[in-house]
Amino acid sequence: MNIFNPNHDRKAIVIFSGGQDSTTCLFQAIAEYGKENIEAITFQYGQRHAIELEKARAIVQDLGIKQTLIDTSVMKAITHNALMDEQAHIEQKENELPNTFVDGRNALFLLYAAIYAKGQGIQDIITGVCETDFSGYPDCRDVFIKSMNVTLNLAMDYQFNIKTPLMYLTKAQTWQLADELGVLDYVQKHTHTCYEGIEGGCGKCPSCILRNKGLKKYLTQKGRKNV
């Protein structure tokens, strides 16, 4: 897995939630661009797992990365889903999107990130979306990202480059990437993934299950290679 591609003459902004995927992307971006060329942008959209905002703030402070926090909580007034309703039971019915899907979330994140990036003279936008081990969210697909990239370029007459380093990685491979970057323990200890907002994870929600299953698979594979 090629993780180092020195690109220190450019700047990049990472859409950063404080979760496993975006934190792994942040570390990879630091390796590729240099810490001084990286910024993080985080969104407060009324998520029930607001603890991730605390994790995000702690991580960027620890790493010395500039963070911009954008309030998009107006979304709660126009859409309903289990990720923004603490009383809703998280579930996925057959042949339907999970009720944790937030309509328009990634489109909005990319739009605001692009507006900010252009103002800072930044072209590269990094997001940790993935369509290999994902929950069926349509806005995590590569076809959407490519479409959004074209739309933003046309909308602002600016050459954005949306990068998705995790797009075709399984969750186990994302853990592998963190390990290759030398930050597996850091990601495991300091990031938050749980939809329920429970410190350390509930172990039962789809996000926790995917995270834990991926870690177990990677560590098992790593153990076999070291035998």
UniProtKB/Swiss-Prot annotation:
**Cross-referenced Gene3D superfamilies, in alphabetical order?**
HUPs
Per its Swiss-Prot or TrEMBL entry, what cofactor is needed? Answer: Zn(2+)
- Which residues are involved in binding ATP? 16-26
The organism's place on the tree of life at top rank: Bacteria
Enzyme Commission number: 6.3.4.20
Cofactor binding mode and count: Binds 1 zinc ion per subunit.
Q: Which InterPro entries match?
A: QueC, Rossmann-like_a/b/a_fold
GO BP terms = queuosine biosynthetic process
Q: In which pathway does it act?
A: Purine metabolism; 7-cyano-7-deazaguanine biosynthesis
Q: Keywords for this entry? A: ATP-binding, Ligase, Metal-binding, Nucleotide-binding, Queuosine biosynthesis, Zinc
What catalytic activity does the UniProt entry give for this protein? 7-carboxy-7-deazaguanine + NH4(+) + ATP = 7-cyano-7-deazaguanine + ADP + phosphate + H2O + H(+)
Q: Tell me the GO molecular function terms.
A: ATP binding; ligase activity, forming carbon-nitrogen bonds; zinc ion binding
Enumerate the Pfam families for this protein: QueC
Coiled-coil-forming residues are: none
Please tell me where Zn(2+) binds in this chain. 194, 202, 205, 208
The similarity annotation says: Belongs to the QueC family.
Q: What does this protein do?
A: Catalyzes the ATP-dependent conversion of 7-carboxy-7-deazaguanine (CDG) to 7-cyano-7-deazaguanine (preQ(0)).
| Annotated protein name in UniProt | 7-cyano-7-deazaguanine synthase
